[in-house]
Each structure stands twice: as structure tokens, then as C-alpha cells.
């Protein structure tokens, strides 16, 4: 049995408690408050899906070239610029075809 001074014993005790506390924190609480067990994995997934449905979170990988389009009822939809250009193109084609077919109706 070695004789440690009171300062060395308190430093040893403090370091031991600190290491044990840090390991416990990293194991249990470091994942945004979710525990590392099976139920918490499903709870985290449920919260992520709810945030996507409520449009509080964006689908990963789908954030480039986005613009905001607001519909009449106040719902905001996020779309790519390519989708918007395709919609404008399709609307112009439909209007042109309707105009051409209107010649035959007269």
C-alpha cells in the first residue's frame, strides 16, 4: 500500500470521478439527448420524420438550387429551378397546342 499525500489522493479521486462521468455522458447522453438503446432509435427516427412532415427539416441531399413557391392556400413548397422551368415549358406547350386546335373549331 503506497502512501499518497492528501492532495494526490484528491487529484486521483477527482480524475477517476471525472473519467467515469465523462464516459457515462458520452455513452448515454451525447446523441442529442437520445439514449443508446433500441427504443430511443425509433423515437429519434419518429422525431426526424415528424420534422420532415412539418417542414422544419429538409431532406438531406435535396437542398441545391431550391426556390420557394407559395400556393394560394398559403402552403409553401420548395422546388428545384429545373422543375419550375419544366412547368413553365409545359404550360407554354399546352397553350400553343390549344391555340393551334382552336383554329379548327372556327
UniProtKB/Swiss-Prot annotation:
Claim: Transmembrane is one of the keywords in the record: yes
Main subcellular location of this protein, as a coarse class: mitochondrion
GO biological process, one term: cristae formation
Cellular component, GO annotation: MICOS complex; mitochondrial crista junction; mitochondrial inner membrane; mitochondrion
Keywords associated with the record: Membrane, Mitochondrion, Mitochondrion inner membrane, Transmembrane, Transmembrane helix
InterPro entries named among the record's database cross-references: Mic12
Bilayer-crossing regions: 11-27
Residue intervals on the Mitochondrial intermembrane side: 28-106
Cystine connections: none
Subcellular location: Mitochondrion inner membrane
Mitochondrial matrix side: 1-10
This protein's record includes keyword Cell membrane: no
Membrane topology of the entry: Single-pass membrane protein
Consequences of knocking out this gene: Increases frequency of mitochondrial genome loss. Partially altered shape of the mitochondrial network with condensed, fragmented mitochondria accumulating at the periphery of cells. 20-40% of mitochondria exhibit an increased inner membrane surface and stacks of lamellar cristae disconnected from the inner boundary membrane.
Subunit field text: Component of the mitochondrial contact site and cristae organizing system (MICOS) complex, composed of at least MIC10, MIC12, MIC19, MIC26, MIC27 and MIC60. This complex was also known under the names MINOS or MitOS complex. Interacts with OM45 and POR1.
Note: Present with 2550 molecules/cell in log phase SD medium.
Similarity field: Belongs to the MICOS complex subunit Mic12 family.
Purpose of the protein: Component of the MICOS complex, a large protein complex of the mitochondrial inner membrane that plays crucial roles in the maintenance of crista junctions, inner membrane architecture, and formation of contact sites to the outer membrane.
UniProt name for this protein: MICOS complex subunit MIC12
Taxonomic source organism: Saccharomyces cerevisiae (strain ATCC 204508 / S288c)
Amino acid at each position: 500500500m503506497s502512501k499518497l499525500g492528501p492532495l494526490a489522493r484528491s487529484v486521483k479521486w477527482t480524475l477517476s470521478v471525472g473519467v467515469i462521468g465523462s464516459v457515462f455522458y458520452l455513452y448515454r447522453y451525447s446523441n442529442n439527448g437520445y439514449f443508446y438503446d433500441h427504443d430511443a432509435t425509433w423515437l429519434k427516427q419518429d422525431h426526424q420524420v415528424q420534422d420532415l412532415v412539418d417542414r422544419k427539416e429538409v431532406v438531406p441531399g435535396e437542398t441545391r438550387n431550391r426556390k420557394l413557391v407559395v400556393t394560394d392556400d398559403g402552403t409553401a413548397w420548395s422546388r428545384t429551378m429545373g422543375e419550375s422551368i419544366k412547368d413553365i415549358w409545359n404550360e407554354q406547350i399546352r397553350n400553343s397546342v390549344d391555340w393551334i386546335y382552336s383554329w379548327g373549331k372556327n
